[in-house]
């Protein structure tokens, strides 16, 4: 059985550059970089998090 099209990525804070979250994403369905608003424990507030390599 072949592996899926999903790859593991990490989400890093755009302000302090700390990697706080890991998730998976479908490579075929969404080819652009993922950007979400998540809570950053280092900044202690919600910040934008961009996709980075694990």
Swiss-Prot record:
Family: Belongs to the bacterial ribosomal protein bL33 family.
One MF term in the entry's GO annotations: structural constituent of ribosome
PROSITE patterns: RIBOSOMAL_L33 (PS00582)
Any one cellular-component term (Gene Ontology): ribosome
InterPro entries per record: Ribosomal_bL33, Ribosomal_bL33_CS, Ribosomal_bL33_sf, Ribosomal_zn-bd
Taxonomy, superkingdom: Bacteria
Keyword Nucleus attached: no
Lineage: Bacteria, Pseudomonadati, Myxococcota, Myxococcia, Myxococcales
The entry's keywords: Ribonucleoprotein, Ribosomal protein
Protein name: Large ribosomal subunit protein bL33A
GO biological process, one term: translation
A UniProt-annotated Pfam family: Ribosomal_L33
